[in-house]
Amino acid sequence: MARVKRGVIARARHKKILKQAKGYYGARSRVYRVAFQAVIKAGQYAYRDRRQRKRQFRQLWIARINAAARQNGISYSKFINGLKKASVEIDRKILADIAVFDKVAFHHSG
């Protein structure tokens, strides 16, 4: 059997991981073993947080709408219920934007 020399492939794989770990602190950006673990963990966090971001933004929008609605003397749930009954189909993202940047329009919507 022919001798298999794997140096090129191993170096390429190591380079790829170290490139991904660029900017990490200390050994995490220099030592392959540590960098590999850091990159794997970073990927797990990124995967988890892409899902959490959607929840967090919805929470933020609801908090902003609630605050603006209460300034106009109505609770969030009653405000949303009123919009549903009036068959107004504006999502929470746009409502929150209006609540923050156009208080007059928001006041007239409720």
Curated annotation (Swiss-Prot):
Q: Which UniProt keywords apply?
A: Ribonucleoprotein, Ribosomal protein, RNA-binding, rRNA-binding
Q: Is Ribosomal protein set as a keyword in this record?
A: yes
Q: Which GO terms describe its molecular function?
A: rRNA binding; structural constituent of ribosome
- Keyword rRNA-binding set for record: yes
Q: Which InterPro entries match?
A: Ribosomal_bL20 (IPR005813), RIBOSOMAL_L20_CS (IPR049946), Ribosomal_protein_bL20_C (IPR035566)
- Mind telling me which GO cellular component terms the entry cites? ribonucleoprotein complex; ribosome
List cystine links. Answer: none
Give the similarity note.
Belongs to the bacterial ribosomal protein bL20 family.
Protein name from the UniProt record? Large ribosomal subunit protein bL20
Starting at the broadest rank, the lineage of the source organism is: Bacteria, Pseudomonadati, Pseudomonadota, Gammaproteobacteria, Enterobacterales
